[in-house]
């Protein structure tokens, strides 16, 4: 029977990439990947046995621990960490203009935090605006 694996969607996110890597490490045969609309949806899907596994972020090098995930490990004692990987994250600034003309940068809060040093050096006057995690935004 094919295993269902929940992850923080939509398709094309780093969470999906991590899900593919982790299912290979776990030897899941042709898993079904289930994108979820929020971290709490991913957590609930595994806590309520709606999937066989879930892929969630535990921490990142800039912002530290992901509190929603850590809180879920306390709230749902039946959830446990089976495998962990380090997934390097690479961000890109996409614009149709010159760097000097950029006045706003839109991205997820985690991405803005991870790029804060570069942004402060290269776009010190740009307004940083938070968006939802979506590769479609690009």
Please provide the spans of the model-predicted regions:
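Domain-level signature for soluble enzymes in the chorismate/prephenate branch of the shikimate pathway
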Residues: 1-136
């Amino acid at each position: 029977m094919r295993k269902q694996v929940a992850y923080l969607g939509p398709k094309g996110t780093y969470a999906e990439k991590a899900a593919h890597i982790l299912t290979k490490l776990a030897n899941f045969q042709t898993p079904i990947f289930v994108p979820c609309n929020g971290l709490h949806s991913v957590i609930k899907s595994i806590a309520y046995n709606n999937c066989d596994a879930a892929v969630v972020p535990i921490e990142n090098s800039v912002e530290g621990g992901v509190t929603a995930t850590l809180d879920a490990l306390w709230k749902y004692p039946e959830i446990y960490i089976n495998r962990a990987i380090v997934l390097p994250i690479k961000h890109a600034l996409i614009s149709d203009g010159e760097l000097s003309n950029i006045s706003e940068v839109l991205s997820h809060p985690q991405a803005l935090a991870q790029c804060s040093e570069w942004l402060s050096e290269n776009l010190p006057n740009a307004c940083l605006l938070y968006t939802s995690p979506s590769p479609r935004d690009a």
